[in-house]
Amino acid sequence: MMKFFRQQASQPAAKPGEKPAAPRRMGPPKFTPEQQAEIDKYKEEVKAWRLGLDLSKVEGARKLLSDAGISVHIVKMQPSGMGSDEEVDYAFKVAKAMGAKAVTDEINLETAKRVAPFAEKHGMYMAFHNHMQYAEEGFSCDPILAISPSIMLNFDAGHFFGSTGIHPNEMIKKYHDRIYSIHLKDKTGPTTGDQPNTNQVWGQGEMPLEDVLLLIKQEKWPIYCDIELEYDIKPWSDSVKEGDRKSVV
């Protein structure tokens, strides 16, 4: 299926001396009838697999992680892309079987309206993740949070800072009781030279990481903090070395 989406996203490179074309605005991709038929068939196959999944297999995966000292608090299932209510229900069943208390997806008002009843049904949270939305004029998470107490934020402090330049603690102080988890990464701000809003090695960017962590520690707020590795890794390193505890302390 990804081949179709890559074709839609591809953009001709600029010729020597030409100015690169402006990035395409992302919208619903257009497919030929044959491509759409193949996509629809694939979706039905995925739906059948999901609804027929034996949850004992998920519980087995949870045990493997638990035995390795890893606990799961949130699962990225993206119910916004699921075509049926049965699949949305499946998302919460799987997350619960993994030991998580929340499912996450991209922040969106319509998704919140659709998914909130399922989160309430399972006694879980729908925790919405952000990219650059807070930098968009007029955007607010308030209407989304107002839908249900089961709606929470999976607040990406790095993307928030990188796109707005605003200290993440302003958001955290205001919404700490509606923030389930926080994504932490180091980035440059939106006005930084020729590399604005760019991922950096932990501790080498402009994101006020220490401030965020100290605030949560001092206030004793029960918020999960997840460190994300999103920058390009040098050839002499790897993801394990970059994520080593000594590297981020």
Question: Where would I find each of the regions flagged by the language model?
Answer:
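Active-site acidic/histidine proton-transfer and metal-coordination neighborhood
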Residues: A22, T32, Q36-E38, K43, ...
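Histidine-acidic metal/acid-base catalytic patches
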Residues: R6-A22, P29-F31, E38, E44, ...
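Non-membrane alpha-helical structural segments and their capping/turn regions in soluble enzymes
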Residues: L51-L55, E59, D85-D89, L109, ...
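Mature N-terminal segment immediately following signal peptide/propeptide cleavage
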Residues: M1
